[in-house]
């Protein structure tokens, strides 16, 4: 028997395998690029190490690529065989159960396994990170905060990677709307480790949600030198910087960040793609000519047409296909989502309830015979309080909040738009875009004085 760097038992007699696995976990917590190298080293030292095999399966799932789903299942079988031959701790058996649940699309059952682990082993960083991930896509900020609140008392500054846990807590609080606690925790984590990009991004979310664009730009500028050696999550953090400049109307800067930072090269990573697609959609709403950028995204989207693994990603693939006029490919995506919606897992239910209608509305807005804003509004308006089921953060999902507001305005449904935009400007008072659109709605309702006041706030 051996132990990882948190003191948790690992079923292996190889010290080299245990050390490599610990390095893998450290790298995973820190968004390092050598995580896979360390995992391969662990398996090279002990090819039957159950936790290494299970972790390999987890990582295959995190890519959300169909060809890797089979490899995740293969990893689970190998781990099962290793456990049958060697035995395993209850913690490792729970991890195997989580992977097996994920293999059949039952992300909720997988999350339950990780939460069970954390009740007994609150220092299991893999269970912490993965439950954080699945709560993010399934249950939202409240569940994220509850999960981290359960484990946080077991951590202190003397324990390795305490700062990373503080960063996870920060983002959980932010998504639950507790911005004061989120900002304090995130800045505390960054003070411990300036390379903590998850904590950096948690604070960036606070600035985004509160409309503190100048502070957000300064925050990210001060920390961006720390990201050079980190994995592709750094692109998402650059995306946050672009969001501030977008709100300030600095569209040339947004395009510079798009081309030079978060979409410098086409990527098949779904997070990279969603950064790019959502930003182009927002730029289109501001009347910005994005050139051939949609076409490049549509090429990537076509490669993933039919994936139907993560509905959040599929909804962004539809943006690119529809905007670039690839209607046949867009219909193929709808068909694949409809087929996926017949399944039994959480993502099947999300696809049926939210993903399919959102994709249909997106397509309606881009039909070659003219934008059908009214049809899109009819689809999106009843869904506005259910979009959270797609997963993603408040900031990411805001593209669909913008979509329903813009569809209502373009369809001439100014009273409906007025209500939604009143709500929007009340919760995000420093949003010039929100105030401009609110002015448009008020003007359409015949409230010239109100429109003028809204435009003043947008200035």
Feature roles, as predicted:
Residues 15-18, 23-40, 44-48, 53-89, ...:
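Inter-helical turn/loop elements of alpha-helical hairpins
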Residues 15-20, 50, 88-94, 122-128, ...:
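Generic helix N-cap/helix-start motif at coil->alpha-helix transitions
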Residues 20, 27, 37-39, 72-78, ...:
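Alpha-helical solenoid repeat scaffolds, predominantly canonical TPR units
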Residues 27, 60, 101, 135-138, ...:
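Residue at a conserved register position within TPR or TPR-like alpha-solenoid repeats
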Residues 34-35, 72, 110, 144, ...:
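Single-residue signature of alpha-solenoid repeat helices
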Residues 245-458:
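Helix-coil-helix junctions within alpha-helical repeat/solenoid scaffolds
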């Amino acid at each position: 028997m051996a132990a990882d760097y948190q003191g948790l038992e690992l079923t292996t007699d190889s010290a080299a395998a245990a050390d490599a696995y610990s390095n893998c976990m450290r790298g995973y917590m820190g968004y390092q690029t050598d995580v896979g190298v360390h995992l391969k080293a662990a398996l090279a030292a002990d090819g039957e190490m159950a936790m290494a095999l299970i972790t390999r399966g987890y990582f295959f799932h995190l890519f959300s690529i169909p060809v890797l789903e089979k490899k995740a299942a293969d990893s689970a079988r190998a781990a099962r065989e290793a456990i049958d031959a060697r035995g395993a701790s209850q913690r490792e058996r729970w991890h195997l159960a989580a992977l097996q649940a994920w293999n059949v699309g039952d992300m909720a059952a997988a999350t339950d396994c990780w939460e069970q682990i954390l009740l007994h082993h609150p220092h299991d960083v893999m269970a912490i990170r993965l439950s954080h991930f699945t709560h993010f896509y399934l249950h939202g900020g409240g569940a994220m905060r509850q999960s981290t609140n359960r484990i946080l008392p077991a951590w202190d500054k003397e324990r390795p990677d305490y700062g990373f846990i503080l960063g996870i807590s920060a983002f959980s609080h932010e998504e639950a709307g507790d911005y004061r606690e989120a900002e304090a925790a995130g800045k505390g984590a960054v003070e411990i480790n300036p390379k903590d990009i998850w904590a950096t991004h948690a604070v960036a979310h606070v600035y985004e949600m509160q409309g503190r664009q100048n502070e957000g730009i300064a925050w990210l500028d001060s920390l961006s030198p720390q990201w050079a050696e980190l994995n592709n999550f750094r692109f998402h953090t650059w995306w946050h910087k672009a969001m501030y400049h977008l709100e300030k109307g600095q569209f040339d800067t947004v395009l510079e960040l798009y081309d030079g930072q978060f979409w410098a090269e086409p990527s098949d990573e779904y997070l990279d793609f969603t950064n790019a697609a959502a930003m182009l959609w927002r730029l289109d709403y501001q009347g910005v000519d994005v050139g051939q950028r949609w076409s490049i995204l549509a090429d990537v989207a076509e490669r993933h047409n039919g994936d139907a693994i993560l509905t959040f990603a599929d909804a962004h693939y539809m943006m690119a296909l529809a905007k670039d006029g690839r209607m046949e490919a867009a219909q193929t995506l709808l068909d694949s989502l409809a087929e996926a919606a017949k399944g039994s897992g959480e993502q099947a239910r999300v696809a049926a309830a939210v993903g399919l209608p959102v994709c249909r509305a997106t397509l309606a807005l881009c039909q070659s015979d003219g934008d059908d804003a009214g049809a899109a509004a009819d689809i999106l308006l009843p869904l506005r309080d259910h979009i959270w089921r797609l997963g993603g953060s408040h900031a990411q999902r805001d593209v669909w909040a913008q979509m329903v507001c813009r569809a209502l305005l373009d369809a001439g449904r100014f009273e409906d738009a007025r209500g939604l935009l009143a709500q929007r400007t009340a919760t995000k008072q420093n949003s010039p875009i929100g105030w401009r659109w609110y002015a448009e709605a008020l003007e359409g309702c015949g409230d010239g004085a109100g429109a003028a006041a809204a435009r003043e706030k947008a200035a």
